[in-house]
């Protein structure tokens, strides 16, 4: 009987100790959970605070929802921004933004993506999901590479990539952008006009000033709808005669190149209203050929007079 009682006593003690140890372990675990819970709560509060800040920057204009951030510190955009996926335009300037988030693909109704004057280094391939996007403005950034997926943005009408400095090529797939009307690639490192531009059927305005162009493609005339072509401050030495086949061209800027002559075929470009040949080492001296204003601008009247003088000079030399 005593043995049975002793055994029961040991069993009871063991149970008590096990219960006590379990409680100690639970208390220890609870103490460990509390800091984590506080961290989670802090994260939730921070996300709500950030989302509230972003919501304050959303406004309605012309029937569209715009997100406008200007001169604030947003080097990265938070994931909670997807809660505002109904926004149709992003206007984010001078924030130090370094990256376009991959969740941009969730903004399926986005019409304008304007991230000018930031520090963006690349365009994510997810950009191709934005089939409603009409304007992509990334001037004054650090973009070096354009993904071919941009060619899937079938509604794109305006593309601005000026002053990214080291950008020197565009993917061929961009020729699929059949609604693209305006392209600004000025102040970059292009050595040639990207072939995809020659195959864009709607292109009307192209600025490639301040690049490293040494020549123009012979088939430049394929840009049949082009109205304005800006090629100032390049390294061009000649203009191909095929430019005369660009029947809709009304503005041609060639100032600050290395041109020694003006192609005679340009005399027949009846739609050409504005042309600038200023700061080129042209062969003929035209001191008295045009009035002071035209001499300053080296415009259309200067061009016509130059061609006529060149033709007359060639005839005199032949005789």
Per-range role (PLM):
Residues 215, 226-251:
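A contiguous binding-surface segment within folded domains or other stable secondary-structure elements
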Residues 1-196, 200-218, 227-228, 241, ...:
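The feature captures the LRR N-terminal capping module
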């Amino acid at each position: 009987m005593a043995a049975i009682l002793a055994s029961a006593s040991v069993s009871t003690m063991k149970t008590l100790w096990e219960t006590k140890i379990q409680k100690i372990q639970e208390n220890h675990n609870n103490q460990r959970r509390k800091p984590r819970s506080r961290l989670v709560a802090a994260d939730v509060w921070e996300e709500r605070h950030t989302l509230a800040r972003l919501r304050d920057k959303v406004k309605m204009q012309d029937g569209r929802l715009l997100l406008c951030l200007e001169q604030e510190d947003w080097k990265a955009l938070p994931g909670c921004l997807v809660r505002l996926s109904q926004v149709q335009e992003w206007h984010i300037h001078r924030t130090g933004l370094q990256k376009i988030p991959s969740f941009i693909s969730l903004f399926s109704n986005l019409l304008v993506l304007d991230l000018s004057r930031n520090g963006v280094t690349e365009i994510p391939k997810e950009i191709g999901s934005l089939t409603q996007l009409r304007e992509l403005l990334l001037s004054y950034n650090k973009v070096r590479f354009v993904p071919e997926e941009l060619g899937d943005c079938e509604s794109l009408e305006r593309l601005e990539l000026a002053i990214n400095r080291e950008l020197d090529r565009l993917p061929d797939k961009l020729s699929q952008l059949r609604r693209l009307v305006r392209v600004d690639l000025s102040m970059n490192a292009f050595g040639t006009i990207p072939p995809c531009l020659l195959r864009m059927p709607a292109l009307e305005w192209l600025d490639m000033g301040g690049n490293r162009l040494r020549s123009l493609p012979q088939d430049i005339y394929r840009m049949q709808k082009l109205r304005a072509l800006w090629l100032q401050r390049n390294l061009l030495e000649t203009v191909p005669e095929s430019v005369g086949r660009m029947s809709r061209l009304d503005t041609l800027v060639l100032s600050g190149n290395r041109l020694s002559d003006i192609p005679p075929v340009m005399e027949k470009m009846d739609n050409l209203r504005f042309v600038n040949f200023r700061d080129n080492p042209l062969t003929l001296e035209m001191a008295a050929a045009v009035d002071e204003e035209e001499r300053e601008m080296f415009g259309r009247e200067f061009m016509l007079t130059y061609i006529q003088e060149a033709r007359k000079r060639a005839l005199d030399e032949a005789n």
